[in-house]
Amino acid sequence: MSDILTKIEAYKREEIAAAKRARPLAELAAAAKTASPPRGFVAAIREKLAGGDTALIAEIKKASPSKGLIRADFDPPALAKAYQQGGAACLSVLTDTPSFQGSLDYLVAARAAVTLPVLRKDFMFDTYQVVEARAHGADCILIIMAALDDAAAQDIEDAAIALGMDVLIEIHNRDELERALKLRSPMIGVNNRNLRSFEVTLATSEALAPLIPADRLMVGESGIFAPADIARLERVGIATFLVGESLMRQHDVAAATRTLLARDSLRTTGTR
């Protein structure tokens, strides 16, 4: 595990312990049962792809450890609506506070504003967090293979599936891919950001995509700023993308989303 993930795990473990004291699992599980039913995250992506469209998971992110504050004018419901109007298939909402200035309240507010399925984007170390995600309306959770051993990843995935949620399994090297393929969830996200150095290169997706079985749903993550980046990854078979920072920095988020997804000559020549 990288140094940054070690630090993150330390504070997340403290957060989880405090959350369990404040709201016991039994109470949280009861809330999860009465939450709005899950919206199919994978199903929404597959519907876009079946129509010949690129599937975008549009991210609501206020800040990041590497870039600091990304968007000062931060209104999750308005951003969610803009992404939906721009053609996104799903949303991703950062809920980690120390590193990303995120909040579960942002997820609740964003989901209430739209009909799109929503991913809780956070560092998951305990099945309590999965129940917490569902209780707040999340339709999908994230498993970062670099942060978990196989047993923990399996437990978290099992908890999510039991609650009717989808799972995005994130990898950034071949070893993590091999471990991810032991899990049941079809969605494999290739993070182009090195979690140790924070360096971003699309070559990561280009190297790993050919190794991912055809029955899995590939997602390109990080380093996607323009239609040319999407076209580059489409050439190795990736048609679903998670994009946050480049869209969050735009004044007109809906227009920027439409532009990113625009099917111009650059993307339609030899890219599919």
From Swiss-Prot:
Q: Which reaction does it catalyse?
A: 1-(2-carboxyphenylamino)-1-deoxy-D-ribulose 5-phosphate + H(+) = (1S,2R)-1-C-(indol-3-yl)glycerol 3-phosphate + CO2 + H2O
| Amino-acid biosynthesis listed as a keyword | yes
GO MF term list = indole-3-glycerol-phosphate synthase activity; phosphoribosylanthranilate isomerase activity
Which PROSITE patterns does this one have?
IGPS (PS00614)
Report the PANTHER family cross-referenced here: INDOLE-3-GLYCEROL-PHOSPHATE SYNTHASE, TRYPTOPHAN BIOSYNTHESIS PROTEIN
Top-level taxon of origin = Bacteria
The enzyme's E.C. designation: 4.1.1.48
Listed pathway(s): Amino-acid biosynthesis; L-tryptophan biosynthesis; L-tryptophan from chorismate: step 4/5
EC top class named in words = lyase
Q: Which organism does this record belong to?
A: Rhodopseudomonas palustris (strain BisB18)
Gene name per UniProt: trpC
Q: Would you kindly state one Gene Ontology biological process term found in this protein's UniProt entry?
A: L-tryptophan biosynthetic process
Instruction: Give the protein's recorded name.
Output: Indole-3-glycerol phosphate synthase
Coiled-coil stretches? none
Give the keywords, sorted.
Amino-acid biosynthesis, Aromatic amino acid biosynthesis, Decarboxylase, Lyase, Tryptophan biosynthesis
